[in-house]
A protein has these predicted regions:
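Bacterial N-terminal signal peptides that target proteins for export
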Residues: 1-10
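Cleavable N-terminal signal peptides
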Residues: 11-12, 23
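Sec/Tat signal peptide C-region and signal peptidase I cleavage site
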Residues: 19-25
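N-terminal edge beta-strand
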Residues: 26-49
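Beta-strand cores of secreted/periplasmic/IMS beta-sandwich domains, seen most often
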Residues: 41-62, 66-68, 105-118
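Short edge-strand/loop segments of extracellular domains
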Residues: 69-75, 136-138
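Extracytoplasmic beta-sandwich strand-turn segments characteristic of Greek-key/jelly-roll folds
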Residues: 73-111
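Extracellular/periplasmic metallocenter environments
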Residues: 97-138
Length: 138
């Protein structure tokens, strides 16, 4: 009887450990950079480590980038000067620079709950529509 109780206790503790690991599992967001848009799949994730798999699928030979900004502003309402978002006025979490046409790059960031604007900040690209919103929940 004692052995059965211990076995159940060990199994319960092991299950709790597995559950907490699953809660902190790394997530991936596929970010597709087009000529005039950024498509995110999914648009919402849980807080923690998130890997952005960034692909430049633009129909031209332009390099793009992906900048992740924590902000309560709408992704289309960020402060801009001379065709670029003023990143220094916002909380930049990380970025992937210079993704050539037809190429992929990855970056892993730790994201807290909140709203994030995901943008390309090459001159003129944000104004052309290269922005999206990512929502991070607990």
């Amino acid at each position: 009887m004692n052995m059965t109780w211990r076995t159940a206790l060990v199994a319960s503790v092991a299950a709790l450990g597995i559950g907490s690991q699953a809660a902190h599992a790394q997530q991936t967001v596929k970010a597709t950079l087009r000529s005039d848009a950024i498509q995110l799949e999914p648009h919402d994730v849980k807080a923690g480590k998130v890997t952005f798999d960034v692909a430049n699928s633009a129909d031209n030979n332009m390099a793009h980038e992906l900048v992740v900004l924590k902000t309560n502003l709408a992704d289309g309402a960020l402060p801009v000067r001379k065709g670029e978002v003023l990143e220094e006025r916002l909380h930049k979490i990380g970025e992937v620079e210079d993704v050539a046409s037809g190429r992929h790059k990855r970056v892993t960031l730790t994201l807290a709950p909140g709203r994030y604007a995901v943008i390309c900040n090459k001159p003129g690209h944000y104004a052309a529509g290269m922005h999206a919103t990512l929502v991070v929940s607990r």
